[in-house]
Amino acid sequence: MFVLPPPPPRYTVPVAYAAGASNGMAVPVVETNNIISHPEGGCSLQAGEGTYLLRDDLHLATPPPHPSEAPVMNPNPLATVPAPPTSGVKLSLVSIGSRIKTPTPSVDGVGAASLFGDGNPALAAPPVKEGLKRRKPKNNIIKSSSSFVSRVITHETATKRLNDRNPDGLFAFANINRAFQWLDLSAKQKEEPVTKILFTKAHMISHDINELTKSTSHIDVVMGSSAGDIIWYEPMSQKYARINKNGVVNNSPVTHIKWIPGSENLFMAAHANGQLVVYDKEKEDALFAPELGSPSAETMKSSSGRSPLQILKSVNSRNQKTNPVALWKLANQKITQFAFSPDRRHLAVVLEDGSLRVMDYLKEEVLDIFRSYYGGLICVCWSPDGKYIVTGGQDDLVTIWSLPERKIVARCQGHNSWVSAVAFDPWRCDDRTYRFGSVGDDCRLLLWDFSVGMLHRPRVHQANARQRTSMIVSNTQHLNRHRADSGGNRTRSDSQETADTYNSYDPTVRHPVEPRARTALLPPIMSKIVGEDPICWLGFQEDSIMTSSLEGHIRTWDRPREGINDNYSYSPAISASATGSGRADSMMGSL
């Protein structure tokens, strides 16, 4: 009896990718290329200071799936099986020639805080000889035999391009599906990546550059993946190291990752299981066991059993031979993003449970918990002076919070779908007026201007508003007493309302949701649909505004020639990013 052999596996993109053999014949490797276009007269942004003109649209090529990846079938739209974690295109920008951003004074006038882990001698860095080159990862990513990395493609004239370029030019690192690209945005052929890394199955979800260690011969990049693995990558030498390999410390996806300000080695990663983990790029990993018996963990326990922060390993632990350096459990739901304050003391964390948590991460304490109207919060950023926090979320709103007053300032209404990224424009901020932008799944870019004087609280329920103000003052007085108590003893507030909110063992203030009738509303100064797919990332440069989208469009608008405020001298790489995980609900024309 004649039996036919089974058919070969079918992939989404047949024979488009994968070096190998088919029916005895070699299969060529087909690469997809980035495309750049220069639209003329389209999609300009009109603001009070002038017109922002679209310079170019760089479309990153989406890589085909790896041959070992199972074919993507049409799923049941009603299925409740969670989709694999992914992310739209995010950018990490760096200018080698620019000076490092200096810390700004804190809101209480004390100045920049000490560095994370300074009080622990076990974290003291070994002495380094002056003039010695910075340490690089050990493994060559081009010659790697790891199954985690599929291929690495370098430009044929990469060395010449790096030697001939202007050090003040802008490098960009971008993720798109399982590809990670290193781009030179100052080159004439900016669409040609210097290096493209293709991972086997994992998608890089978030990445960051260490501004402290950058030089003409060294750039430290960390990237967190959907598999939970973290890559420390040095592109100049093409060396890399794999941290949290196979999820030995935390096996859930990395949702956000940032270098800790002022540190050469430490970075913080948010995981999808609600944990914040601090890693050291030069330490080995070890199977993690919680240190629940530590004094720090006991300190954060409240008598009501509601602990806003469970310290599974403290930065003050003497056991610092392996990763993690510190590990905190905030919730059982996903941490979507976090941001460090300019004074290097506070940490703003947003979660899928709809909460904004403000931490003093040097003391490992949660100070405030705010709530959205409904749905999760997706993105967060700080004002350049550290006085305000801006968040965006699934309630289609952008919200401004005041750190000194510890309250909501205004709700910003203008998006028609989830807000995926927010960022301040430091070149258009001064002592009184602030400019920030937001993008969302409605394909819109919005610009906002606000000052405290221009915000007016609605007149209804004035008596209740006065009562609420007195409660906030009482809460603020309690926090000030708590901060002044260096011995760690917490005093009970005299206010009965405050006592119901927290107790002597819990310094956290849980703020109730402020009703809409008592919240100021702020309209945008500009609203524009800038593409056909959701926008995932927003960044402000000294000469431009940049966005990136779910399908890989990186758009750049030139600023008007006049009207740039030079009061601030921050690093050119000021950006914000967050995962946008929804399609546009509706689209409207520009306002």
Curated annotation (Swiss-Prot):
Alphabetically sorted, this entry's keywords are: Repeat, Transcription, Transcription regulation, Ubl conjugation pathway, WD repeat
Q: Which domain of life is it from?
A: Eukaryota
Q: Where is the composition biased (Polar residues)?
A: 496-506
GO BP terms, alphabetized: carbon catabolite repression of transcription
Q: What are the GO cellular component annotations?
A: cell division site; cell tip; nucleus
The UniProt entry, under Pfam families, shows: WD40
Q: Which regions does the record annotate with the repeat WD? A: 249-289, 330-371, 372-411, 414-458, 530-567
Annotated segments matching region Disordered:
477-510
Q: Describe the function of this protein.
A: Component of the regulatory network controlling carbon source utilization through ubiquitination and deubiquitination involving creA, creB, creC, creD and acrB. Required to prevent the proteolysis of the CreB deubiquitinating enzyme in the absence of carbon catabolite repression. CreB deubiquitinating enzyme stabilized in a complex with the CreC leads to the expression of genes such as those in the proline and quinate pathways.
Q: Which family does it belong to?
A: Belongs to the WD repeat creC family.
Summarize the subunit comment. Answer: Interacts with creB.
The molecule here is called: Probable catabolite repression protein creC
What species was this sequence derived from? Aspergillus niger (strain ATCC MYA-4892 / CBS 513.88 / FGSC A1513)
